[in-house]
Amino acid sequence: MKVYPSIRIMCNKCRIIRRKGIIRVICPNSKHKQRQK
């Protein structure tokens, strides 16, 4: 899981979800997991 000021979609399987105000990217490829500060 990487934390970025702005997240970006790295492939077409990445999904942006919002949980309790935190924006995350979930993807089958674990290298693509991201969270916004």
From Swiss-Prot:
The molecular function terms of the Gene Ontology recorded here are: structural constituent of ribosome
Q: Which Pfam families match?
A: Ribosomal_L36 (PF00444)
What are the recorded Gene Ontology BP terms?
translation
- For this UniProt entry, what is the primary localization, expressed as one broad class? plastid
An annotated GO cellular component: ribonucleoprotein complex
Annotated transmembrane regions:
none
Q: Which UniProt keywords apply?
A: Plastid, Ribonucleoprotein, Ribosomal protein
Q: Which SUPFAM superfamilies match?
A: Ribosomal protein L36
> Where in the cell?
Plastid
Question: Record's HAMAP family?
Answer: Ribosomal_bL36 (MF_00251)
Q: Which family does it belong to?
A: Belongs to the bacterial ribosomal protein bL36 family.
Q: In its UniProt entry, what is this protein called?
A: Large ribosomal subunit protein bL36c
Gene that this sequence comes from: rpl36
